[in-house]
Curated annotation (Swiss-Prot):
It catalyses: 5-(methylsulfanyl)-D-ribulose 1-phosphate = 5-methylsulfanyl-2,3-dioxopentyl phosphate + H2O. The gene is mtnB. Keywords: Amino-acid biosynthesis, Lyase, Metal-binding, Methionine biosynthesis, Zinc. Binds 1 zinc ion per subunit. It comes from Bacillus cytotoxicus (strain DSM 22905 / CIP 110041 / 391-98 / NVH 391-98). This is Methylthioribulose-1-phosphate dehydratase. NCBIfam families: PRK06754.1 (NF005244), salvage_mtnB (TIGR03328). It comes from the Bacteria. Pathway: Amino-acid biosynthesis; L-methionine biosynthesis via salvage pathway; L-methionine from S-methyl-5-thio-alpha-D-ribose 1-phosphate: step 2/6.
């Protein structure tokens, strides 16, 4: 029980930090943190809650299928299936899904992925190669959640990663809450930089990687 309370506090503090950046507009987004590995349980944000408020009903404990462990009237977030896929296929400890203007704009510029290279902050992703290039996959925003989950699952390849959903934010995961937040901050910085650079250069050149 002590572990559950400790994880709850960590997730609540993380929610406050991300809320202060306006990364949960209009109740959007969801976050989770692993509580136990065997059996797999994790805390996830409840659906439809105003994340600018802190209440006892902010999160609920769910199992490996995303079903509530304890009796509750709360509903887990609609995208819980994305979190279950990550926890079931990796050793990740925290998953963050946020909607920002920049990550939505990026998904309207490119079709299958966005490629960014030679930025110092890429090292925050534990990539130390000089002049490194990263590729962030983009999937379609399928209304049918199981279909969205299947498209998403194809890009779960390690204990840390990120997937953009067209017009539906980014999902980032890492080994723990610190790692996941650091990665999310890095991606959002890179998206903001990329969009600003394109605005100076005159936009995305037409080609295979141009969605507009």
């Amino acid at each position: 029980m002590k572990q559950l309370f400790r994880k709850w506090h960590t997730l609540s503090e993380l929610k406050k930090e991300l809320t202060n950046r306006n990364w949960f507009p209009a109740t959007s987004g969801n976050i989770s943190i692993k509580v136990s590995h065997e059996p797999l349980t994790f805390l996830i944000s409840a659906s439809g809650k105003d994340k600018t408020k802190t209440t006892p009903d902010d999160f609920l404990l769910v199992d490996h299928q995303g079903n509530p462990v304890l009796e509750t009237e709360l509903r887990p977030s609609a995208e819980t299936i994305l979190h279950t896929h990550i926890y079931n296929h990796t050793n990740a400890g925290c998953v963050l899904h946020v909607h920002t203007t920049d990550n939505n704009v990026i998904t309207n510029l490119y079709e299958k992925e966005v490629m960014i290279r030679n930025q110092e902050i890429i090292k925050a992703l534990n990539i130390w190669e000089e002049g490194a290039t990263i590729h962030i996959p983009i999937i379609e925003n399928y209304a049918h959640i199981p279909l969205l989950g299947e498209a998403f699952k194809k890009h779960i390849q390690s204990d840390c990663g990120a997937v953009l959903i067209r017009n539906h934010g980014i999902t980032v995961w890492g080994k723990d809450s610190f790692d996941a937040k650091k990665r999310l901050e890095a991606y959002e910085f890179l998206f903001q930089f990329h969009i600003k650079l394109l605005s100076i250069q005159g936009g995305v050149s037409s080609g295979a990687n141009s969605y507009s």
